[in-house]
Amino acid sequence: MAKVCQVTGKRPVTGHNVSHAKNHTKRRFLPNLHTHRFWVESEKRFVKLRVSSKGMRIIDKNGIETVLSDIRARGEKI
């Protein structure tokens, strides 16, 4: 399963670990993803989404119905 947020589209990015001696080694910065169940009142069921913590804040702000309609408009199956 891809490490991608279903709400924001956040995905891993690459960068460097930098030691005190300024040696650079490659690393990946991973998004803070959680699999979370949300209750959808209109459908009378839970929907399981893989969302980042920012995605959860967006759902709290806009509502799960609005966010689900945006995800479905992108063509993603839920």
Curated annotation (Swiss-Prot):
Coiled coil: none annotated. Pfam families: Ribosomal_L28 (PF00830). GO terms for biological process: translation. It comes from the Bacteria. Keywords: Ribonucleoprotein, Ribosomal protein. GO terms for cellular component: cytosolic large ribosomal subunit. Residues 1-22 are annotated as: Disordered. GO terms for molecular function: structural constituent of ribosome. Belongs to the bacterial ribosomal protein bL28 family. This is Large ribosomal subunit protein bL28. The lineage of its organism: Bacteria, Pseudomonadati, Pseudomonadota, Gammaproteobacteria, Cellvibrionales.
